[in-house]
Amino acid sequence: MASSPCPPTCIIVLMDRTFMFVGALMGFAGVGLGAFGAHALKGRLSPEMLAVFETAVRYQMYHALALLVTAVLLTRTEGGRAVLVAGWSFTAGILIFSGSLYALALTGVTILGAITPIGGVALLIGWAALAIAAF
């Protein structure tokens, strides 16, 4: 019987580093996009589309922090599987929710707003998974 190349503890270490990296990267991008919105887009976008862009930045930043917390919780709690679900849900949620709002604000293509709720549901799943991990 062949042994697994990476035992479960190895997977947790890989995932906590992955979520730390993705969270830090999303935070970095959020700061840059926030500055871009405040300086380069003000006056170029309608007030409504600028508000959409700012909402995308805000949710990206909140969930970048949630990913960093998820990375820490992976090594500090017994709820490994639920914490993994939370991390991947936050990652997907940021990409879909904030990504679709950025695209909507920058292009004005309103159909892009139709996928935003999918990202919102992913973010909600992430928070629910963290709550489950507490037990």
Predicted regions and their residues:
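N-terminal polybasic/positive-inside topogenic patches
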Residues: P5-P7
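Polytopic transmembrane helical bundles with strong interfacial aromatic enrichment
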Residues: C10-F135
